Amino acid sequence: MELSFRRNGRLWLLLLGVTLGARSAWSVEETDYERHFQELVSPFMDSAKGGSLLGSDGNTLTYHVFRRRESRPAVLILTGYAESWLTYGETALDLDQAGYDVYVMDHRGMGFSGRLAHDPRIAHIPEFQVYVDDARTFLHQVVLPQVRGPLFLLAHSMGGLVGAYLLEKEARHFRAAAFSAPLFELNTGMVPEFLALGVVNLQVAIGRGAQFAPGRGDFDPTKVDPSQCSTTHSVARCRHQLDLYQRVPETFIAGPSNQWVKEVIHATHRLPDLVSSFKALPILILQAEDDAFVRSGSQSKVCAALTHCELIMLPHTFHEILQEKDPARNAAMRAILRLFHEHQMG
């Protein structure tokens, strides 16, 4: 008797969930992390096909594609603030081994894409919409022409904010979207947001828009103790990222500009108006319990406004969920893949 995959999809997903849940780790375990990374992840990253395209203003955007065959489902990754595609080698390998092609682009002013400030260490944009326009350009010029199977979105931090704006216009192209610690509200620390916005508005008004925002710009990765990392509890993964800044200094970002802070805050304020445009899309939001960079309240509000949204708070996690210690990271990857697998059939 021939079985229909579609009719028996739930059983298959159940079996898959048991298999995923039984795994103790994914591509790389923290134990002897660097050796495993060099043996497993580095060769995989070498297999990526790199390319570049021009943004709407002629700025160069770099991207990388991990593709095995036309019929596979695919994941578009939108990276976080100050990140490059190099940060996502481990995650890309996990997705590849789970059966997905991966497309990842460096945001303008970050990674290997063109810089917009006089100082290449400054994350700067004239307006937030350029991030969204770049993502749409990447989607239409690179991703959609190649993908023949279902397409999914995985967006982290600032990429989550860009992703929400992308979905406003392009939700029809995606089966589901997973957000990791999305920047739906900037954490301005002890300074109230309205006051922080007032300060950067003043800086922009006096012609300092492309300069470091107050209190930013003094980040030195050589002085960070991996055991005291504020982005992840994983000493091994923190050390790897810090070493990456030294090995590939052109990807290093020391801080955001005044204009960047202004644009991001304004973009978060417009989020409630966007939700209705992708309200029916299956959404997963992974929330870090101890996030020092974004506030979780707006993540919960966005999820509550969506029809099919699951919010998972991961205990004992800092902002970089996909760079966390194995137990938390494995839980995050299981949740992401469960979402993607469940919606492959449409």
Features from the language model and the residues they span:
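An N-terminal hydrophobic leader/cap segment in hydrolases
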Residues: 15-54, 61-64
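Active-site glycine-rich loops that stabilize anionic/oxyanionic intermediates
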Residues: 72, 80-83, 158
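Conserved alpha/beta-hydrolase
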Residues: 92-118
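Alpha/beta-hydrolase active-site loop
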Residues: 123-143
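Alpha/beta-hydrolase-fold enzymes
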Residues: 162-252
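Short beta-strand/loop motif that positions the catalytic acidic residue
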Residues: 279, 285-287, 291
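Catalytic active-site module of serine/aspartate enzymes centered on a nucleophile-bearing elbow/loop
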Residues: 310, 315-346
